[in-house]
Amino acid sequence: MKKFSKIFFYLTAVVLLSWLLPWLLQFAASKPGNDPFTLYSCVTKRFAYIQSSKDNGVKRYDANGTEYTVAQFDSILPTFYYRQLFSKDRLPDTINGKEVTPKIIAHGNFTFKQSARDVNVTKPALNMIMESMPDRIDLENPIEAFRTTDRITFIDMRDNTVNEKKSALFDKVMKQKGFEFPMRTLSGNPTNRKEYDEGYLMVDNNHRVFHVKQTKGLPYVRETGVAPELGIEHVAITEFSNRKTLGLLTDKDNNLYVLNRDYTLHKLPIDKYDPKTNTLTIMGDIFYWTLKISDERGVTTYAVDADSYAFADSLRYDYPETALDKWSKYIFPFELSFTSYDDQWVKPRVSMGSCWVLILNFVLAALFYSM
C-alpha cells in the first residue's frame, strides 16, 4: 500500500509539474510579438507596412525598404487613409483610372477575419433566420429559428412552437432543388446590424453548395453550381457593403475560393489555408484585397486584384524565435495544457519535447531512486 501511495504521489507530481512549470516559464519569459500592420498599395504596387520598436519608435516602409513620412504613407494608401486625405484636400479625383470619392471608397472597403477558434466550435442545433425583404427599410430581428435533420424544421421563438406550414414548404422546395439531407455545414449572420441579408450558405450531404434565405416569408433556394468534386468543407457568408461577393469557401485540399453574388466561383491564388489551424484576415478596397494567413510560425500576406482576383504580390513575415521557444523543448520532455488558441474547448493536451530529454529524465530518476 505504501509503494502504491508513492507511485500515485509521483504520478500526480509529474502531471501537475508538466502543466505548471511550462505555464510559469511561458508567463515569466514570453514577450508579445506582433507582425507589422501591412497593406498593399494601389499607388506604388508594393506592400507598405508600419514597424514599431522601443528603440526606433514607429517607422513606415514599403517592401523595397523605402521609408516614408506620415503624410507620404497616407498618400500611398489612399483607400485606407481617405478620410485624412479628404480633410486635408489631398484625396485625388482618380486613382489608376478609377474615379474616387470618400463615398465610393467607403462602399468598397471591407474587413473580414476568421480564426481557428471561430471554426473549431460545437455548432448550435438551432439557427435563427431573418426576413431578407422586410416591409420597412431596416432589417428586423429574427423571430424564427430552424434546425436540420433529415428535413428542415422552423420554430417560432416567441412561443417555442413548430411552424409546420413553413417547415413543409421550405423542405419541399429544398428537396426539389436537389438538397440532400443531412446538411454538412452552413454559414449565416442573422443580425439586423448590417445593410442587407443574404440568409445562409449551406453545404448538403453531397458537398453541393446552396444559397437559402427567406423572402416575404417564402423560401429562396438556389444551387450555386459549385462542383461537388471540390469537396467544400467550410463556408463563410460575407455580406460586404459592395454586394459583390456572397461568401468564402474552402475545399478538402484547403484551397480558398470566393463566391460572387452571381454564383461564379474564383479560386484565390494563394497557398493553402486551413481554417482549423490558421487565421485569415482580409482587408479589401476597390483595387486590391490584402489577405493575411497566420500560423504558429508567422504570417504570409498576399495581394490580389479586387476585380479579377489575379495574384499581385506576396510577403512572408516570420515571428522572431525567442530563447524560450528554442530551449523549452529541451527542458521539458513533455508538456500538459488544457486550452489552445485554436479552439474554445478545455481538455487535456500533451505535446512532446525532445526524446533525449525524456531519456535523460528517466536516467536521473533511476539514479535518484537507487540512492
Residue ranges and their predicted role:
Residues A310-I359:
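Short, aromatic-rich amphipathic segments at membrane interfaces
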Residues K6-Q26:
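Hydrophobic membrane-insertion alpha-helices, especially the h-region
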Residues K2-L11, P348-M371:
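Juxtamembrane interface at the cytosolic side of transmembrane helices
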Residues T215, Y220-A310:
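Membrane-proximal low-complexity regions enriched in glycine and acidic/polar residues
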Residues G97-V173:
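A cross-kingdom signal targeting lumenal/periplasmic-facing segments of multi-pass membrane
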Residues P36-Y40, S75-N96, T101, K123-P142, ...:
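Repeated scaffold domains used in trafficking and secretory/extracellular systems
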Residues V43-A71:
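Short extracytoplasmic
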Residues P22-S52:
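Alpha-helical transmembrane signal-anchor/signal-peptide segments
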